[in-house]
């Protein structure tokens, strides 16, 4: 009864799940600006370059009656298609886990910000942006949807490498729209 009174059962079921493994595959878009990709996804154009990512995350803070968590995530990704290289990303950010419909469909939204290191200068980023670097800023936005009180959810993510307005490079970066699975444990 105490768990029920503290909020959604979907959120409460995740209270002790401080770790997650995510696996996703995405396709790189030729749309340069991430906000244009989000505003008009139906008209997005893509190149023949893809990425497959495995990630582990850890909750490092809980706030607002467990509705908001702070997470750190490490990723290993492989880029294939028109380019072939590895990518390592480390990001931290918030995840909101409580919505009015969470008892029907467990939902979360998240944002992560950190660094991305590619094993070589990504060819597709050079083609799209004119230049790039191995080390860029990395950020992501995602939405998860799954059954209430379940350890798994479908993951829809925008995976973004960026020069951060000249902070790490004059040009470079990419946007990938990805779909995968997130498992909490």
Write out the residue ranges for each language-model feature:
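Sec-dependent N-terminal signal peptides
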Residues: 1-2
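Short glycine/proline- and aromatic-enriched beta-strand/turn motifs that initiate or cap beta-hairpins
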Residues: 6-58, 182
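Outer-membrane beta-barrel transmembrane domain signature
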Residues: 58-65, 70-173, 182-185
